[in-house]
């Protein structure tokens, strides 16, 4: 029988509930337990797919094609269990499901209310999500409840968690509450009052936390922990300090050293083997002792909010671990390139253009791609970054001066990138879309396997085939591929069913390392294994740096 750990947050948002939940899951998995995680989001949107990156940050795509919260990316990076659509749900999905049932008459004429109908539906979604775990029936399901205690939006989720813990009985569920202990510089001390009030608010709802994770910019002294324990009615050893560190991969060891996994296992009456966190220790050791260093420029329009590129940033960090190379990422606003030119790129060892939507900033990205191609600087284009690389090549090499995407110019006569109208999903089902389709849930989503052209750089990196996740509406137009290939561009991977271009590259006679991919490889990178594409990219950046240093010498 699956047991549940509910993770809640108090005082303020963005304290790191997702990292804390993922770190706990990693420790429990290291003890031989099968673990899954769920994220409950209180917003009314059905999913984050149509939300602005400035509002929500990255949208993480699961293997089965769900657009989910970025915390699911942390979950997959910290444990071996893969996430699915059922691992993330929102208030919007809950209400949509309940209203559909009411319209069908499932409630037999009853008045449909938040309690019990909404709370029952939340519990059903939680249990369904746990049951769908890719690891089989999990021993523990960790349920992260988004938002902050006291928010109106979170109340139904907290009430559902309270009811569920009561229904399951003792030793079947426990609560971990993450809260802020701020340091007041003028007073020169940490303040515990916000934590006391947060726990009090939680207890008013009927939930008494078993563990407190106290976030601060420093380790919390024993005296303060005792005070928190006294006023919060939580045992002193269950008041756990979570201080700022320079790498999230240090968190599992930090929590284990303070006994979090022991407390959870005792509360849930679990008797697993001892934790083995040697993998995490080795990762941290590699992270802190690199042998090389490179600087990669990430050219985009969301560079002021790095949460928009969370998985991509982590994938580069994973590559740094597996190449013993410190990767410095410089975020470059593509609109500034449009105004000031490409001088800001000339010191870089490699250039990366990530995915994105909309016309704004695209000409700056194209200018960056042109610079990388002409200066022989390693280039990686992801999703939109591949499409723009094709547009730049079509304009500047093939001579199609009006080459563009119909996303940016619907009337362009040279539509080298255009809307996909029909494709197969990962299960072989035909999906269709038109210009008038809803934005939400109408992209090509999820993982798909496709063969790689022999003798290409793509084959060196991936082998015979590639299986990656997608999130896009537009695709390189096959009508222009013969002209692109006549100019030297190589389509190195295509979908087996629709023959859609998945990867492009330039031959080594034209460029040492120039690759574009229509998919999102960052979603499958983990600290354990890294990712072959990002490892190859970092190695190319290092080779470019060493070659330039040799020329200058």
Swiss-Prot record:
Positions annotated to bind Mg(2+): 71, 144
Pfam families on file: CTP_synth_N, GATase
Regulation of catalytic or functional activity: Allosterically activated by GTP, when glutamine is the substrate; GTP has no effect on the reaction when ammonia is the substrate. The allosteric effector GTP functions by stabilizing the protein conformation that binds the tetrahedral intermediate(s) formed during glutamine hydrolysis. Inhibited by the product CTP, via allosteric rather than competitive inhibition.
Keyword Transcription regulation in record: no
Domain Glutamine amidotransferase type-1: 295-547
Miscellaneous remark of the record: CTPSs have evolved a hybrid strategy for distinguishing between UTP and CTP. The overlapping regions of the product feedback inhibitory and substrate sites recognize a common feature in both compounds, the triphosphate moiety. To differentiate isosteric substrate and product pyrimidine rings, an additional pocket far from the expected kinase/ligase catalytic site, specifically recognizes the cytosine and ribose portions of the product inhibitor.
Name of this chain's protein: CTP synthase
Organism classification: Bacteria, Pseudomonadati, Pseudomonadota, Betaproteobacteria, Burkholderiales
């Amino acid at each position: 029988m699956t047991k549940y750990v509910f993770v809640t947050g108090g005082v303020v948002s963005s304290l790191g509930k997702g990292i804390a939940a993922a770190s706990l899951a990693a420790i429990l998995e290291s003890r031989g337990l099968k673990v899954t995680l769920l994220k409950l989001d209180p917003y009314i949107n059905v999913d984050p797919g149509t939300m602005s990156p400035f509002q929500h940050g990255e949208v993480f795509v699961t293997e089965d094609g769900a657009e989910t919260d970025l915390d699911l990316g942390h979950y997959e990076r910290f444990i071996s269990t893969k996430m699915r659509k059922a691992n993330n749900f929102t208030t919007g999905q809950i209400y949509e499901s309940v209203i559909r049932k009411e319209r069908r008459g499932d409630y037999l004429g009853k008045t449909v209310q938040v309690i019990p109908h909404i709370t029952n539906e939340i519990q059903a979604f939680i249990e369904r999500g746990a049951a769908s775990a890719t690891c089989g029936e999990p021993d523990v399901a960790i349920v992260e409840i988004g938002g902050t205690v006291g928010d109106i939006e979170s109340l139904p989720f907290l009430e559902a968690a309270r009811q569920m813990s009561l229904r399951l009985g003792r030793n079947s569920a426990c609560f971990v509450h993450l809260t802020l202990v701020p340091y007041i510089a003028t007073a020169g001390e940490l303040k515990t009052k916000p934590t006391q009030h947060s726990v009090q608010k939680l207890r008013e709802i009927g939930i008494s936390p078993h563990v407190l994770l106290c976030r601060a910019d420093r380790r919390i002294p024993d005296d303060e922990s005792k005070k928190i324990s006294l006023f919060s009615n939580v045992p002193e050893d269950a008041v756990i300090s979570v201080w700022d560190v320079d790498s999230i991969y240090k968190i599992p060891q930090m929590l284990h050293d303070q006994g979090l996994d022991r407390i959870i296992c005792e509360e849930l009456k679990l008797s697993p083997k001892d934790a083995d966190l040697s993998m995490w220790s080795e990762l941290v050791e590699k992270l802190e002792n690199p042998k090389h260093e490179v600087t990669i420029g990430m050219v985009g329009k969301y560079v002021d909010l790095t949460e928009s590129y969370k998985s991509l940033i982590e994938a580069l960090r994973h590559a740094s671990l597996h190449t013993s190379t410190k990767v410095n990422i410089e975020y470059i606003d593509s609109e500034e390139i449009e105004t000031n030119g490409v001088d800001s790129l000339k010191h870089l060892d490699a250039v990366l253009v990530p995915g994105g939507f909309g016309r704004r900033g695209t000409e700056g990205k194209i200018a960056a791609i042109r610079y990388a191609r002409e200066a022989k600087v390693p280039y990686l284009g992801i999703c939109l970054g591949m499409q723009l690389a094709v547009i730049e090549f079509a304009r500047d090499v093939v001579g199609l001066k009006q080459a563009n995407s119909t996303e940016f110019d619907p009337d362009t006569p040279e539509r080298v990138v255009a809307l996909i109208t029909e494709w197969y999903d990962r299960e072989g089902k035909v999906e269709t879309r038109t210009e008038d389709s809803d934005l939400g849930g109408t992209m090509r989503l999820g993982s798909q396997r496709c063969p790689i052209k022999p003798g290409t750089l793509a084959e060196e990196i991936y082998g015979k085939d590639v299986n990656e996740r997608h999130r896009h509406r537009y695709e390189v137009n096959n009508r222009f591929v013969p002209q692109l290939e006549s100019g030297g561009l190589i389509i190195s991977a295509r979908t087996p069913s629709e023959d859609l271009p998945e990867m492009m590259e330039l031959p080594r006679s034209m460029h040492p390392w120039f690759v574009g991919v229509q998919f999102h490889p960052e979603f499958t990178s983990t600290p354990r294994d890294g990712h072959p594409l990002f490892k190859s990219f970092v190695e190319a950046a290092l080779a470019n740096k060493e070659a330039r240093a040799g020329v200058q010498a």
